């Protein structure tokens, strides 16, 4: 029996030496809406805090999208334009729904699925650490990579960092988005308040604060 992709015809592998090629061709076929819907839902979820389908990687027939017409339209545009992720992100970020105020009205304060207001979300662990470095003008040091390598550029979770582990970095032992956690916890709060990572960046003699003091920068200019 020849291998048959989901919702597709049996694959003709005569003369094929690298089986990854027909797999890639099927994944990126315009007729394969499984791929485009999955990517669109995942990118939408990253920007909006919740996916059109939740959980993000549970796209089964019995778990419909909150706004199926929107998922279909974005998926079709994504597939018809060469799976251009920049275009997809631009479409999302220039939309009215992405630019909604996060302040909710009493009648829609609990909504997280219909996007009646922007859903406030916590920064992922890697983005949070990089953001602290950007604000402080410091560089994080990870063993085995050059100084200044950003947390979002680390190839895997084997680079030791108590900060990243405490604030929700996944260990990447299962293929599920659910492994990453954004749930607040006491350890993360205490580490941000008085942990050694933030303390080290605040006391770094070459940080942005030291530069402001040396240059006698006014508060207004420092904020600006």
Give the location of each predicted region:
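Long, His/Glu/Asp-enriched segments that create or flank divalent metal/ion-associated functional microenvironments
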Residues: 136, 140-145, 150-157, 163-169, ...
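Primarily short, surface-exposed interaction patches in extracytoplasmic proteins
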Residues: 1-145, 170-171, 177-180, 196-224
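N-terminal start-of-chain detector that recognizes signal peptides
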Residues: 103-106, 160-164
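Short, glycine-/Ser/Thr-/acidic-enriched flexible segments
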Residues: 157-159, 196-197
């Amino acid at each position: 029996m020849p291998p048959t992709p989901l919702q597709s015809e049996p694959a003709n592998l005569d003369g094929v030496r690298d089986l990854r090629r027909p797999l890639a061709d099927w994944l990126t076929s315009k007729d394969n809406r499984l791929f485009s819907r999955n990517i669109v839902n995942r990118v939408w979820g990253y920007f909006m805090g919740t996916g059109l389908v939740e959980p993000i990687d549970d796209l089964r027939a019995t778990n419909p999208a909150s706004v199926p017409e929107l998922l279909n339209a974005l998926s079709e545009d994504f597939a018809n334009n060469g799976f251009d992720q920049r275009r997809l992100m631009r479409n999302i970020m220039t939309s009215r729904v992405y630019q909604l105020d996060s302040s909710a009205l009493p009648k829609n304060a609990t909504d997280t699925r219909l996007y009646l207001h922007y859903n406030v979300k916590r920064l992922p662990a890697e983005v949070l650490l990089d953001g602290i470095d950007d604000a402080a003008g410091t560089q994080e040091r990870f063993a085995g990579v050059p100084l200044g390598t950003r947390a979002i550029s680390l190839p895997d979770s084997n680079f030791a960092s108590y900060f990243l582990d405490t604030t929700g970095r996944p260990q990447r032992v299962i293929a599920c988005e659910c492994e990453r956690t954004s749930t607040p916890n006491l350890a993360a709060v205490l580490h941000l308040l008085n942990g050694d990572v933030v303390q080290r960046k605040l006391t770094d003699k070459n940080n942005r604060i030291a530069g402001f003091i040396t240059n006698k920068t006014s508060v207004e200019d420092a904020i600006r």
